[in-house]
Design a protein with these regions (language model features):
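Cleaved targeting-peptide boundary
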Residues: 15-25
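Residues that define the transmembrane beta-barrel architecture of outer-membrane proteins
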Residues: 29, 67-73, 100-104, 156-160, ...
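Outer membrane beta-barrel
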Residues: 30-44, 64-187, 212-219, 328, ...
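N-terminal signal peptide c-region/cleavage motif recognized by signal peptidases
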Residues: 11-13
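Outer-membrane beta-barrel pore domains
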Residues: 46, 133, 236-442
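Outer-membrane pore/translocation modules
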Residues: 42-62, 142-147, 155, 184-198, ...
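Outer-membrane beta-barrel domain signature
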Residues: 22, 60-66, 94-97, 149-155, ...
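Transmembrane beta-strand segments of Gram-negative outer membrane beta-barrel proteins
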Residues: 23-55, 432
């Protein structure tokens, strides 16, 4: 298998993921092999929109049945040559990405002292509460973290850099502080084209922290991540930049006319500067904030998270969201109800520089074409949506769970695609997704 050629896999970067993947026996082994898998089928009732778990997914779940939503295989290898020194490798293949192996972890973990650990290399993403276990179906109570708020951050599956973790045990409670920094590159999919197009996404200057409090029946985590530059490059972006440069050059050439009145001269120069400012329109400097909790009381369990993403880019738009899951166990069976919503809450991109000049019909026609393109891009950049999910988890065997889930997803209107794969607007903005999964760890 292609996955085996990676030399695969290691434990997930958080303690919760380690407990799921590696067990809790605490036995030190020089070489440990383990993994996780989900065999899933999902049915989409919508002919105009596909379902995705991330914006790096190659093959959305279109109308009908598909394994592309949740089917995944993860293998991991951990080598501990010395006490306190561990090498980790983890690879994952997803059906939605043609089962091509992706390296999620390739890191050195070094214990520096009591409760203090340093990780160097590629690690699991720390952006949101469940980011580190999002692909491990068995570790999630539900079939998957709600794409309503997780589709954007699931694209950033890993971090290439370093993190420092300090754990302090206080009786039956503990505190975990984490600081991290690095970069990450991936292929971003624009499903608003038919066929879909790809862009090279590069995140540099990524840094942040998280603080977790683990009590007997409650875990609370707060995190904040800042990214200096989130750049998207593709043939389409290059074409946009080229068109803006040509129009800006034409305006500056017109401004050289000595017969123009000063007010018109200033207006043309300002308009040229405005066009140049629209280059690389998807580049942003996002800040991700998350406050999450996982609590249980007797047979009840509550999962909740508040999230915020401020891209400092009016085309992408700021978003605030939440997810809430309530479950109750009846022996091996756990029915649950989940709610999630993401809402855009920022101003629209200023495209006044694309207004007609009234001086040249050909130039004004080109400006209008770009204006229509930017208006369309703003529509597709709005990932606002809300979802209601009901499901049932059956812990059938040790380390094996079977789940069924019905998701009702809705975007604000027929011209807002949300986190869906929508090639044409307007579209049917209500999607019903039914999923059945078999999750396991080994």
């Amino acid at each position: 298998l292609a996955l085996a050629s990676l030399g695969l896999l290691a434990s997930a970067s958080t303690q919760a993921a380690e407990d799921v993947i590696e067990g809790s026996e605490g036995i030190v082994k020089p070489l440990r092999f383990s993994g996780f898998a989900t065999l899933g089928l999902a049915h989409n009732n919508n002919a105009t929109a596909g379902a995705i778990t991330s914006f790096s997914q190659l093959k959305p779940v279109q109308q009908g049945w598909s394994a592309n939503m949740d089917t995944v295989l993860g293998l991991q290898l951990e080598w501990q040559p010395l006490s306190g020194t561990t090498f980790q490798v983890q690879g994952v293949a997803r059906a939605g990405e043609n089962m091509q192996p992706r390296l999620r972890i390739a890191a050195l973990r070094q214990q520096l002292g009591q409760g203090l650990n340093l990780n160097l290399g590629r690690m699991r993403s720390p952006l949101f509460f469940d980011s580190s276990i999002a692909e491990i179906g068995y570790a999630n109570l539900t079939v998957r973290p709600a794409p309503t708020i997780y589709a954007a951050v699931n694209s950033v599956a890993s971090l290439d850099g370093a993190d420092l973790q300090w754990r302090l045990n206080l009786g039956d409670a503990s505190l975990l502080a984490q600081v991290f920094g690095g970069r990450y590159d991936y292929t971003h999919r624009f499903n608003n084209f038919s066929p879909a197009m790809s862009a090279d996404a590069s995140l540099s200057g990524l840094r942040g922290f998280s603080l977790s409090a683990n009590l007997q029946h409650l875990t609370v985590r707060v995190s904040r991540t800042e990214i200096d530059r989130y750049a998207l490059r593709s043939e389409q972006v290059s074409q946009i930049n080229s068109g803006l440069n040509q129009l800006s050059g034409a305006l500056r050439q017109m401004a050289l006319n000595p017969l123009l009145p000063p007010t018109m001269l200033t207006g043309l120069q300002t308009k040229a500067q405005g066009l140049e400012a629209l280059r690389n329109p998807f580049d942003n400097r996002p800040v991700y904030t998350s406050v999450g909790l996982d609590g249980n009381w007797q047979q009840w369990r509550l999962l909740a998270e508040l999230t915020s993403m401020d891209p400092h880019n009016d085309l992408v738009g700021r978003g605030t969201g939440y997810s809430l899951t309530l479950a109750r166990s009846f022996g091996d069976f756990t029915p649950y109800l989940s709610l999630a919503q993401l809402k855009r809450s920022s101003a629209k991109l200023n495209t006044s520089a694309l207004a007609p000049t009234g001086l040249d019909a050909q130039l004004d026609g080109a400006l209008n074409q770009l204006l229509q393109g930017f208006d369309r891009a703003q529509q597709f950049a709005n990932i606002s949506s809300r979802s209601v999910s009901v499901g049932l988890r059956w812990d059938w065997r040790e380390n094996i769970a079977i789940k069924t889930q019905l998701d009702l997803v809705r975007t604000p209107n027929t011209n807002t695609p949300g986190p869906l794969a929508v090639p044409v607007l307007p579209f049917d903005n209500k999607l019903r997704l039914f999923s059945v999964t078999l999750d396991m760890v080994f």
